[in-house]
């Protein structure tokens, strides 16, 4: 009787353990999934021109940021993918923040105005750098006025 109880306990522990059985092993072993690189986050927004920054945040170079709108519905699918993603732009604001649009820094939960994201050259259109262009675009002017009016980091939460 004690041998059958011990055998039953061992079989029970094996059934509930996270061992890699032959039928469900990923290629390369059970640690292979952790070795994969960080991928680009899903595209979103009108014409798939933006990238997901969180489950309900979609930002793009020419779009600005959409929060909690129908354009962000696709971003919710990012939660179901097994590998992590990283959006473009340089780090800003909090530890997990990234420059999402000109003057906007987003993490997975919120976005804040950040003047450091204004100076990033990847967010300026080629027309702004042409020989005949001496003033800012209307969007940049509006963003600077908004930043001036808020005087600091105004946080927008969903």
From Swiss-Prot:
A GO term, aspect molecular function: neurohypophyseal hormone activity
Instruction: Please give the Gene3D superfamilies that the UniProt record associates with this protein.
Output: Neurohypophysial hormone domain
UniProt keywords, alphabetically? Amidation, Cleavage on pair of basic residues, Disulfide bond, Hormone, Secreted, Signal
Q: Name one GO cellular component term.
A: secretory granule
- Signal peptide feature range: 1-19
| Glycine amide modified-residue sites | 28
Annotated InterPro entries: Neurhyp_horm (IPR000981), Neurhyp_horm_dom_sf (IPR036387), Neurohypophysial_hormone_CS (IPR022423)
Cysteine pairs forming cystine bridges in this chain are 20-25, 41-85, 44-58, 52-75, 59-65, 92-105, 99-117, 106-111
Which family does the record claim for this protein? Belongs to the vasopressin/oxytocin family.
The name on file for this protein is Vasotocin-neurophysin VT 2
In which organism is this protein found? Oncorhynchus keta (Chum salmon)
